[in-house]
C-alpha cells in the first residue's frame, strides 16, 4: 500500500471518530429541549433515553458479521447517513412514541458505527508502522467538544433547534463525502472464507478484556451521570459547579488520548493500561476522601488521565489476539462495554439509595482494583 494511501486511510478513521463524537454531542443538548417540547416527567424521559441503549445492544453483537460481509466502508456510511436523518427527525417530532422509535434507531445506528469504526481503526493500525489508536479516540473526544460547543453557540445566538441541528448535520455530511471513500472495503483481515457467526460471543482472552472494557465504560458512565450529584450533595458545592467535574475529567481524557500513542510506544501497552488503572483508582479515592474543593476537582483530572487510554489499548490488542477474528472480538468487547454504561449508573443509584454515594463510589474503586488484577493476569498469560 502506498504511503499516501495509508495516510488517507488514517485520516478517514480520524474523520469518522470525530463524526461519531459530533453526533453524540448533537443529541445531548437536545435532551432537555425534547423533554420540554413533549411536556413529560423525568421518569418518562429516562425510559426514552433507555431506548438508545436498547437499540445499541441490539445492533452491536450483529455488527461484526455485517462488517465482514459488507466491509467497513458500507456499514459506516450507512450508519452515518442513518444518524443524519434520525437526528434531524429528533429535532422535529412531537410525539413520545415517535421519539422512542427514533431513539431506538439512533441507538442502533450509533452501535453499528461504534463497532465498525473501531474495527476499521484496528485494521488500519495493523498496516501502520506505529500505534495510533489513542489518537483516533482523541478525535472522538474532540468531536464531542466541538459538537457541544457549536450547538450551544448556535442557540445562544438565537438560532432555532432545527437550524443548530442542521449545521451539525451538514458537517457530518461533509465528513462522509470526504472520507467514506477512503475507508477500508473489507471488515476482517483473516483469509478465512468461513461465515462469521451472527452474534459475537467473547472467547479466550477476549472474555477477560470484555470485562476490563465493561468496567471502564461503567466508570465513565458513573462519572458522567453522578459526578454532578456527588459534587453538590456529598461535597455541598454550589449547583453552578455541578458540571465542572465532568468537564475537567473530559479535558484530561482528551489531552491524554492525543499523547497516548507516544506513551504506548515508549512504555508499552501493559504499562499504559495498568498504570492508567492505578491512577484512576487513586483519583476515586481522592474524590471520596478529600475535604477540599481543589482536591475534588483534582480527583476528576486524575481520573481522566488514568482512564484515557485503557479502552484504546484494549481495542488495539483485539486486533492482535488470535482467539477470535478482529471484527468479532471488537463487537463482543463493545457490547459488554455498553452493558457497563447502561447498568453501572443505575446500580450506583440503587447502592447509593441503600447506603451512600460515598460507598457506591468506593465500590467503583474496588472494581478498578479487580480490573487491574484481571489485566495483569491476561498480559502475563499473553506473554
Mark where each language-model region is.
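Helix-to-loop junctions at the C-terminal end of transmembrane segments
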Residues: 59-71, 256-269, 352
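Helix-loop-helix hairpin linking two adjacent transmembrane segments in secondary transporters
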Residues: 135-184
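Cytoplasmic helix-loop-helix junction between adjacent transmembrane helices
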Residues: 103-138
